[in-house]
From Swiss-Prot:
This is Ubiquitin-conjugating enzyme E2 D2B. SUPFAM superfamilies: UBC-like (SSF54495). It catalyses: S-ubiquitinyl-[E1 ubiquitin-activating enzyme]-L-cysteine + [E2 ubiquitin-conjugating enzyme]-L-cysteine = [E1 ubiquitin-activating enzyme]-L-cysteine + S-ubiquitinyl-[E2 ubiquitin-conjugating enzyme]-L-cysteine. Keywords: ATP-binding, Nucleotide-binding, Transferase, Ubl conjugation pathway. Residues 1-147 form the UBC core domain. The lineage of its organism: Eukaryota, Metazoa, Chordata, Craniata, Vertebrata. The active site is at 85 (glycyl thioester intermediate). One of its GO terms (cellular component) is nucleus. Catalyzes the covalent attachment of ubiquitin to other proteins. Mediates the selective degradation of short-lived and abnormal proteins. Functions in the E6/E6-AP-induced ubiquitination of p53/TP53. Mediates ubiquitination of PEX5 and SQSTM1 and autoubiquitination of STUB1 and TRAF6. Involved in the signal-induced conjugation and subsequent degradation of NFKBIA, FBXW2-mediated GCM1 ubiquitination and degradation, MDM2-dependent degradation of p53/TP53 and the activation of MAVS in the mitochondria by RIGI in response to viral infection Plays a role in early maturation of the testis. It comes from the Eukaryota. It is an enzyme of class 2 (transferase). It holds the Pfam family UQ_con. SMART domains: UBCc. Interacts with CNOT4 (via RING domain).
Length: 147
């Protein structure tokens, strides 16, 4: 079941790729993918290329994929291990969701962080109280790690 669904999503991604995103298997292993999200325009991540790993469980799509950044990023919802705090990757997962929708959700999280559900409270606090400092630091990290 999982493999059939993963193949279908790969075909769908090839035919209708999400804006500024790409993803596909690493080598022959269909359960292990690499994805790329380009830093959205009008965000401090603009111009950066952010790499992520996607690991599908054997119960996919009934269990969510494990998606993590491998590129360092300064963001209140992404910790230093690359873990992402996003409801659809946890409690709000639905088998109707696809990798395309997940990547678009992560991309929109880059534009609109959720400081009220942070993985990194210190960054969330800076985002809430000193947006200029947040944007400056996020841009510096993007230039240092994603370009």
């Amino acid at each position: 079941m999982a493999l059939k669904r993963i193949h279908k999503e790969l075909n769908d991604l090839a035919q209708d790729p999400p804006a500024q995103c790409s993803a596909g298997p690493v080598g022959e292993d269909m359960f292990h993918w690499q994805a790329t999200i380009m830093g959205p325009n009008d965000s401090p991540y603009q111009g950066g290329a952010f790499f992520l790993t996607i690991d599908f469980p054997t119960e996919y799509p009934f269990k969510p994929p494990k998606v993590e950044f491998t590129t360092r990023i300064y963001h209140p919802n992404v910790n230093s291990n690359g873990s992402i705090c996003l409801d659809i990757l946890r409690s709000q997962w639905s088998p109707a969701l696809t990798i395309s929708k997940v990547l678009l959700s992560i991309s929109s999280l880059l534009c609109d962080p959720n400081p009220d559900d942070p993985l990194v409270p210190e960054i969330a606090q800076i985002y809430k109280t000193d947006r200029d400092k947040y944007n400056r630091t996020a841009r510096e990290w993007t230039q240092k790690y994603a370009m």
